[in-house]
């Protein structure tokens, strides 16, 4: 049986307490497509890589999508009312700021597909794009698996140490290290 439509403003009024760090997401639908409502702020430094595209719609405020595009690190600002389709296999780190809300749509992962969470060395003197740690898994529950990966990286310093320069990678962005486009 089909469920009723979701009224986003009403849902947020009644359920915004469900958007908890470090990911701040809640899966509204989780069938052939996963539809997540995502609030800010979040606190993560990983770059997620999945084999299927992701669709972003920014309902309130602006977000920053940090990506690695053909080996180049760059930031894409998705403003209130904007939508953006991220191709599969693109390393990305969604940065959400306080009092912002977006909707993200992802395909159910095909059998045998592998998601990855990758952390890069943040030391400017190290090799650009140096991977500190990468976790791989078949994603069946976006609501819990990404959060578990972030928590694992946070609590295990051995995962955070760069094998090339020895720098300890941050598990969350340092305060003030990312400029909020909502305040520009």
From Swiss-Prot:
Which InterPro entries does the record cross-reference, listed alphabetically? Answer: 3hydroanth_dOase, RmlC-like_jellyroll, RmlC_Cupin_sf
Stored Pfam families:
3-HAO
Q: Needs which cofactor?
A: Fe(2+)
Which keywords, in A-to-Z order, does the entry hold? Cytoplasm, Dioxygenase, Iron, Metal-binding, Oxidoreductase, Pyridine nucleotide biosynthesis
Positions of O2 binding: 44
Task: Offer an example of a GO molecular function term for this protein.
Answer: ferrous iron binding
Which residues are Fe cation-binding? Answer: 48, 54, 92
- If you read the UniProt record, what top EC class would you report for this enzyme, in one word? oxidoreductase
Q: Which reaction does it catalyse?
A: 3-hydroxyanthranilate + O2 = (2Z,4Z)-2-amino-3-carboxymuconate 6-semialdehyde
What's one GO BP annotation on this UniProt entry? quinolinate biosynthetic process
Can the keyword Iron be found in this entry's annotation?
A: yes
Q: Where does a divalent metal cation bind?
A: 121, 126, 162, 165
**Chief localization class?**
cytoplasm
Residues at which substrate binds: 54, 96, 106
List locations, semicolon-separated. Answer: Cytoplasm
EC number from the UniProt entry: 1.13.11.6
Q: Kindly indicate whether the keyword Ribosomal protein belongs to this entry.
A: no
Provide a GO CC annotation, any one: cytoplasm
Similarity comment = Belongs to the 3-HAO family.
Which PANTHER family does the protein's record reference? 3-HYDROXYANTHRANILATE 3,4-DIOXYGENASE
Q: What does this protein do?
A: Catalyzes the oxidative ring opening of 3-hydroxyanthranilate to 2-amino-3-carboxymuconate semialdehyde, which spontaneously cyclizes to quinolinate.
* Name recorded for this polypeptide: 3-hydroxyanthranilate 3,4-dioxygenase
The gene from which this protein is expressed is BNA1
């Amino acid at each position: 049986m089909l469920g009723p439509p979701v009224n986003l403003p009403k849902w947020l009024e009644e359920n915004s307490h469900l958007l908890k760090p470090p990911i701040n997401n809640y899966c509204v639908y989780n069938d052939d497509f996963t539809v997540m409502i995502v609030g800010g702020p979040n606190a993560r430094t990983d770059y997620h890589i999945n084999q299927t595209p992701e669709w972003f719609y920014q309902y309130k405020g602006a977000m920053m999508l940090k990506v690695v595009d053909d080996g180049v690190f760059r930031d894409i600002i998705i403003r209130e009312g904007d939508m953006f389709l991220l191709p599969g296999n693109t390393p990305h780190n969604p940065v959400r700021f306080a009092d912002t809300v977006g909707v993200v749509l992802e395909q159910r992962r095909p059998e045998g597909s592998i998601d990855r969470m990758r952390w890069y060395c943040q030391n400017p003197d190290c090799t650009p794009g140096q991977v500190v740690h990468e976790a791989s898994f078949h994603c069946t529950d976006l609501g819990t698996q990404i959060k578990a990966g972030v928590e694992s990286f946070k609590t295990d310093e051995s995962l955070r140490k760069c094998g090339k320069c020895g720098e300890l990678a941050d598990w969350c962005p340092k305060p003030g290290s990312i400029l909020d486009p909502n305040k520009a």
